[in-house]
Amino acid sequence: MAVAVAEAGARNSTSQGDRAAAVRSRGRSWFLAWLAFLPLVVMRAGTLAESDTFWQIRTGLLTISHRAIPTVDPFSWTMHGRPWTLNSWAFNVLIAGAYRLAGLPGVAWTCAGLAMVAAGLMLFLARELGASPFVAGALLLFTSPLLVGWLSARPQLVDYAAVLVLAILLRRIAAGGKRIWLVLAVGIVSVVWVNLHAGELFGVGMICVCAVALFAKRDLRASGWCLAAGAVAFAGSFLSPYGFGMLGQAAQVQSASAGVVIEWQHLDPTSPTQCAMLAMGLGALILAARRRDFVLVGVLCVVAAGSIMAIRLLPMLVFVALPVLAPSLSRTPVASLLLRRRIVLYLGLAVAVVLALIDMSHIGRPSPALYPVGVVRDIPSDCRLFNSYELGAFVIFERPDVPVSLDSRNDMYGRQRVLADEKTLDGKGDVARELAGADCVLVPPATGLAKWLRSDHGWKLTASDSAAALFVRIR
């Protein structure tokens, strides 16, 4: 009898050991799936190409040094002193702190970390839905060409992560459990999100649609808890330095950006990339509906509809769609095919690692094709500068002593101002009148305005490269 008990104990101990080993092995597989995304993120961080990044760093530095958020425009001569509401003040401080610690490489690494957080949350949700780590990781790698261009150093990275966190929390609220604590967690996420980026207001709408979807399922209890989460999230939206003013600011950004900024344009049905991203989202929506996962149905409905109205939401749609697609692919012949052809994946990953190592030599470098470092340094101090939309933010960062005419804070300048300056940049209209208040001009050398200035005796070309030409008024 004692021998039998001992043998049973030994078998039980062995079984527990095997399960623990399996858990550790599976955990390592998910970690490797997450780590495989790192080379692509590093490649994106190698060059800073987004103009917003530069004025956000400078604004964050200003906030830190003054220990107060700027309330009026301090950077331009066209809007100087005009009231200014920041939609990402905490993100600005975050990357400014990274800049103070490690310069532009610190900013690039910080934003790369945010991108990796979003990828990790995507894989976490895929794991909860029953996906294979290999398939989920492979799917993330295959779709990375669609995502990499959107992983620039901007507060939108926070949006990608926050939407996934909300999806995870809402699914747990719908499933039951400690719902009070989960609702409070939604509130905390909302407060952090709205201070990092005003995109949190989109999350409030997403929660409410999830509540409606659960109501349609006749799960009244879960729907009620989701509504409570939505109310808490809505209240959290006003726990920022701007309070209720954030609502008006969000509307102002949308109205000033529509038809001007590319990422705010409607979906282009002739774009294969945009259509592929939307197709992934719609496919995930169908799968979520078939599984009767009404939380994910609600999330995907809102993000897909938003993506049609503004393509800036397409990467968010892909991040939410991948965890839904991965479990289905894990149970199809696709999974076996990927395993048999994994050598192709490994080779592709090896190439990405090599390219990432090359990019690590210039992490955080401003794109030489867009930002003329040497020319900007040649601008005379305190010279009122007429500049192109993209170059303004870089001048704010590199030369805060030079007031600009325009930059990518389009909510500050307004749609009409941006369009009028684009017309002048083309050399059209009454160019002399538009330049009346400027002493210097910094524009790409191939623009109509640059050609006009070369032929005008009142201006002198003082510096030029492939990205920009600097003209100074002759007195």
Q: Where in this protein do the model-derived segments appear?
A:
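Transmembrane-helix signature of polytopic, membrane-embedded enzymes
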Residues: 28, 34-35, 122-145
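Membrane-interface transmembrane helices that cradle and orient dolichyl/undecaprenyl
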Residues: 166-181, 282-291
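Short periplasmic/luminal acceptor-recognition loop of GT-C membrane glycosyltransferases, typified by
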Residues: 379-418, 438-446, 471
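Transmembrane catalytic cores of multi-pass membrane glycosyltransferases
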Residues: 52, 64, 69, 192, ...
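Short hydrophobic alpha-helices at membrane interfaces in multi-pass membrane enzymes
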Residues: 172-191, 223-228, 296-301
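Membrane-interface alpha helices of multi-pass inner-membrane proteins
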Residues: 40, 143-147, 181-198, 232-237, ...
